[in-house]
C-alpha cells in the first residue's frame, strides 16, 4: 500500500492543531471574602493536574483546559472550602469571580463561651451564635449596645427618654438577666450593665458570642437569661494599624483607632482608643427636651500577650472609660446641674477595668483567670442626686482534664462586690463575697452523641447555699444536621438602683413592699442547626430554637397599681418567657448574601390567677441583613433592618392620652462601601430610612415635659394627682414611656484605613 506523504503530513497537522484548539479553554477571575481579596488561595480542577494559587491581588487564571465538565475547588486556611461545577466546550474563555466565606461566619468557627473550652461550633453541646467584625461593619455604630440591634432575639432597650441609658434584652427577658463578658470575664456588670456598654473599641473585637438561655453553672447567677461574650483579638490576627472614623448629619463623631506594638521577642501589645462626641441638641418632636442625649466619651484599651514555654497562656488587659452625658430641657447648661429651675439629667462616669489569664507552669492544664473593675458615677436626675461606687473583683481556677470519653472541667471561683450610694435605701456599704465550686463533664456517648452534665455551688451569706445544675445533649445526625437540647436553672439577687433606671428618674415614688427574695428560674432550649452546600456554591444555614423559661420570686416593676408609684415586690405567682426563634443565612457565589431572623415569643406574668403580658416585651421581632458586592467597581451595598411587634407600655392611668401599646415599628438602614483604594475603605449611607420615631400617633412622649418638677401639679391628701384646668388628665412628669430611639433619619459618612 502506497502512502501519500503529503496527505499524511496534512492529517498530522490538523490532528495537532485540533487537539490544541480543543484544549484552548481558560477560566480567570478574583477570589475575595466580601470585604477584601484573598491572596494565595489554592484553586484547581478536581481530578486533574490543572491548578494554581491566587496572586497578592486575589486574581487567578487556569489555562489549557480540555473540553469537559469539572469540579472547580478553592481552599485556603481560615476559610470555608468552595466548589462549583464548570463546563467547557471548545475555545471558551470564562470569567468567574468567587466569594469564599471566612470560617468565623460559618458552622466550623471556634467558640469558647458555651463550655469554657475552645471547640468548633458544630462540636459544642451548647448552641452559641457568633458575630464577626464583618457583621458589625454592615451597620456601623459607636457602641456595642447599638451594634446588637440587628441580632435576632436580642433587643437594645432604651430605658429613659432623657439620658438614653439602656440594657440588652434576650428573648424578651430584661437586661439584668443578661451577663456581658469581655474575654470571658464578668467585667460589664452591676452599674456597668447600664452605663458600661459603650466605648469598647470595635477595631479590637474578634467576635461576639451569644448564648440565649441559662449559663449559670459556669458563669454564676447573673447569666440567668443569656450571655454576651465580647472576645478581643489576639496579636496574630490584629492588623499593625487600624483607624475607623465616621460622622453623621446630626453632628455625631466617632473614631476608633487600633495598633499592634511589639515589646521585644516575647511580648506584644494591642492598643485601642475609642472617642465619641455628640454636642448638638436637637428637638424634632417639639417637647423642649433633647431627642438624643449629648455625650463626650473616651475609652482606652490595652491587651498584653506574653510568649511562654509550651505555648502556655499569659495575657493581661485593661480599659479606662470616661463619659460625660446629659439630656433634658433644651436650655439646660451645667450651671443648672442638680437644681430645680431647668430639668436635666447629667451623668459623669469614670470606670477602669483589668483582667488577665495565667496558665500554671505544671503538667496539668490549670488556668487562673481574674478581673477587677472600679465604677464611679456622679449623676443628677433633675434635682435628685445619685452618687454611686461599685467595685467588683473576680478570680477563678479551672482544671481542664480528659479521661477516656469524659472531658472534665473543674473549677473554683470567688467574687467580691462592693457597692455604696447616697440613696436612703442604702444605709451602709454593701460588701458581699461569694465563693463557688463547679464541675462540668462532657461525655462522648458515641460518635454522634454527647452529653454535658454540670453543677455549680455558690455560698451567699444573705441566702445560704445555692445549687445550680445544668445539662445539655447533642445529637449530630450528620455533619450538616445537629440537634441540641439544653436545660438549667438560675438564681439572681436584685439591686434595684444599679439595674432599674426608672427608680431614679421622673416623679414616681419607688416603693419596696417587702424584703426581696432572690429570683429563681428554670429554662429549657431545643436547637436545630442545618447547613446546605449546593453544587453551584450556594450556602444555606438554618438555625432554629424553641425556648421556655419559668421564673419564681420574679421581681418586676409594677407601674399599674398606682400611677404615681413604681412598686417592687416578689411576684406571687410565676413569670414565663416562651417562644420560637430562627435564623436563615443565604450566601450565593454571585456575591449576594442574605440573613433573615425572626422570633415569636410570649412573655407573661401570672399573679393571683391573672395572666398578663409584661411591660416592654414584644410578641414578635424580625431582623434582616442583605449584602451585595459589585466587584468590577469595588462597591458593596448593605441593607439592614429590624421590625418589632407591639409592646405594652407604662402609662399614668386610664386618663393618660398616650397609647397603652406601641405600634409595629421598624428601623432600616442602607450603606455603600467603596474599596477601590489600597488599604482604604470609604463608606456612607442613611440610617432610619423610614424616619420612624416613637412620637408618631401620640400627643406626646414625655408627660408634662413643660413642668418637669411638678410645680403646677395638685395632689390630694392621699398623694393622688387631682385633675385641674392646667392638668386635665391628672398627670405627673414621666419620661419612662419609652420603647425605641427618638433619633430620626440621618446620613453618615466614614473612612477606614488598615495596615497589615
Where are the regions that the model predicts?
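Flexible loop and strand-edge segments within Gram-negative outer membrane beta-barrel domains
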Residues: 278-299, 305-366, 372-391
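Short acidic/polar hinge/loop motifs at secondary-structure boundaries
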Residues: 63-64, 169, 185-212, 300, ...
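Short, acidic, small-residue-rich periplasmic hinge/interaction motif at the N-terminus
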Residues: 32-36, 42-46, 75-79, 89, ...
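Gram-negative outer-membrane beta-barrel transporters
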Residues: 444-448, 541-550, 570-652
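Membrane-embedded beta-barrel scaffold of Gram-negative outer-membrane proteins
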Residues: 266, 365-379, 476, 484, ...
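N-terminal periplasmic accessory domains that precede
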Residues: 94-99, 144-147, 166-169, 181, ...
Amino acid at each position: 500500500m502506497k502512502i501519500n506523504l503529503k496527505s499524511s503530513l496534512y492529517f498530522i497537522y490538523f490532528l495537532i492543531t485540533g487537539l490544541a484548539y480543543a484544549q484552548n479553554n481558560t477560566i480567570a477571575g478574583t477570589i475575595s471574602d466580601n470585604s477584601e481579596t484573598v491572596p494565595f488561595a489554592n484553586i484547581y480542577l478536581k481530578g486533574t493536574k490543572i491548578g494554581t494559587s491566587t496572586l497578592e491581588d486575589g486574581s487567578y487564571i487556569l489555562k489549557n483546559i480540555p473540553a469537559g465538565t469539572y469540579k472547580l475547588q478553592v481552599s485556603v486556611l481560615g476559610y470555608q472550602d468552595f466548589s462549583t461545577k464548570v463546563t467547557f466546550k471548545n475555545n471558551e474563555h470564562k470569567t468567574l469571580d468567587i466569594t469564599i466565606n471566612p470560617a468565623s461566619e460559618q458552622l466550623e468557627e471556634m467558640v469558647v463561651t458555651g463550655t469554657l473550652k475552645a471547640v468548633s461550633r458544630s462540636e459544642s453541646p451548647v448552641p452559641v451564635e457568633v458575630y464577626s467584625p464583618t457583621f458589625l461593619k454592615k451597620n456601623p455604630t459607636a457602641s456595642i449596645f447599638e451594634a446588637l440591634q440587628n441580632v435576632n432575639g436580642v433587643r437594645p432597650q432604651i430605658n429613659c427618654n432623657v439620658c438614653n441609658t439602656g440594657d440588652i434584652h434576650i428573648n424578651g427577658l430584661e437586661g439584668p438577666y443578661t451577663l456581658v463578658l469581655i474575654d470571658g470575664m464578668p467585667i460589664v456588670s452591676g452599674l456597668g450593665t447600664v452605663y458600661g456598654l459603650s466605648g469598647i473599641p470595635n477595631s479590637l473585637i474578634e467576635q461576639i458570642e451569644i448564648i440565649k438561655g441559662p449559663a449559670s453553672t459556669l458563669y454564676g447567677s447573673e447569666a440567668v437569661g443569656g450571655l454576651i461574650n465580647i472576645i478581643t483579638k489576639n496579636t496574630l490576627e490584629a492588623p499593625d494599624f487600624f483607624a475607623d472614623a465616621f460622622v453623621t448629619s446630626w453632628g455625631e463623631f466617632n473614631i476608633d483607632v487600633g495598633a499592634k506594638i511589639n515589646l521585644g521577642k516575647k511580648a506584644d501589645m494591642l492598643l485601642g482608643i475609642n472617642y465619641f462626641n455628640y454636642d448638638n441638641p436637637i428637638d424634632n418632636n417639639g417637647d423642649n427636651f433633647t431627642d438624643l442625649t449629648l455625650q463626650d466619651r473616651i475609652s482606652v484599651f490595652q491587651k498584653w500577650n506574653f510568649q511562654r514555654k509550651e505555648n502556655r497562656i499569659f495575657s493581661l488587659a485593661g480599659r479606662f472609660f470616661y463619659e460625660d452625658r446629659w439630656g433634658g430641657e433644651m436650655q439646660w447648661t451645667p450651671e443648672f446641674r442638680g437644681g430645680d429651675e431647668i430639668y436635666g439629667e447629667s451623668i459623669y462616669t469614670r470606670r477602669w477595668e483589668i483582667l488577665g489569664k495565667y496558665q500554671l507552669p505544671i503538667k496539668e492544664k490549670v488556668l487562673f483567670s481574674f478581673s477587677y473593675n472600679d465604677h464611679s458615677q456622679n449623676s443628677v436626675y433633675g434635682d435628685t442626686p445619685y452618687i454611686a461606687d461599685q467595685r467588683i473583683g473576680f478570680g477563678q481556677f479551672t482544671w481542664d482534664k480528659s479521661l477516656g470519653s469524659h472531658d472534665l472541667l473543674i473549677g473554683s471561683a470567688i467574687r467580691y462586690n462592693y457597692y455604696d450610694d447616697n440613696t436612703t435605701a442604702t444605709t451602709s456599704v454593701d460588701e458581699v463575697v461569694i465563693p463557688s465550686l463547679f464541675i462540668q463533664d462532657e461525655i462522648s456517648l458515641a460518635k454522634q452523641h454527647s452529653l454535658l452534665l454540670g453543677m455549680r455551688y455558690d455560698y451567699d451569706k444573705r441566702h445560704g447555699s445555692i445549687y445550680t445544675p445544668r445539662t445539655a445533649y447533642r445529637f449530630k445526625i450528620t455533619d450538616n444536621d445537629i440537634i441540641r437540647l439544653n436545660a438549667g436553672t438560675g438564681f439572681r439577687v436584685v439591686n434595684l438602683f444599679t439595674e432599674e433606671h426608672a427608680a431614679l428618674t421622673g416623679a414616681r415614688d419607688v416603693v419596696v413592699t417587702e424584703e426581696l427574695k432572690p429570683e429563681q428560674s428554670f429554662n429549657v432550649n431545643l436547637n436545630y442547626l442545618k447547613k446546605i452546600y449546593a453544587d453551584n456554591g450556594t450556602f444555606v444555614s438554618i438555625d432554629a430554637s424553641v425556648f421556655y423559661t419559668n421564673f419564681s420570686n420574679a421581681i418586676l416593676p409594677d407601674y399599674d397599681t398606682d400611677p404615681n408609684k413604681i412598686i417592687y415586690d416578689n411576684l406571687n405567682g410565676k413569670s414565663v418567657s416562651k417562644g420560637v426563634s430562627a435564623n436563615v443565612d443565604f450566601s450565593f457565589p454571585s456575591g449576594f448574601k442574605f440573613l433573615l431572623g425572626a422570633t415569636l415569643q410570649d412573655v407573661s406574668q401570672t399573679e393571683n390567677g391573672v395572666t398578663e403580658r409584661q411591660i416592654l416585651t414584644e410578641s414578635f421581632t424580625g431582623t434582616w441583613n442583605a449584602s451585595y458586592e459589585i466587584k468590577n467597581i469595588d462597591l458593596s451595598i448593605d441593607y439592614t433592618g429590624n421590625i418589632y411587634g407591639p409592646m405594652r407600655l407604662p402609662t399614668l392611668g386610664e386618663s393618660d392620652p398616650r397609647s397603652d401599646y406601641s405600634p409595629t415599628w421598624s428601623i432600616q438602614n442602607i450603606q455603600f462601601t467603596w474599596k477601590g483604594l489600597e488599604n482604604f475603605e470609604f463608606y456612607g449611607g442613611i440610617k432610619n430610612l423610614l424616619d420612624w420615631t416613637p412620637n408618631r400617633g401620640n400627643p406626646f412622649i414625655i408627660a408634662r415635659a413643660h413642668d418637669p418638677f411638678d410645680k403646677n401639679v395638685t395632689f390630694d391628701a392621699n398623694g393622688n394627682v387631682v385633675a385641674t384646668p392646667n392638668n386635665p388628665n391628672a398627670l405627673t412628669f414621666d419620661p419612662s414611656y419609652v420603647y425605641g430611639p427618638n433619633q430620626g433619619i440621618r446620613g453618615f459618612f466614614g473612612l477606614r484605613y488598615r495596615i497589615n
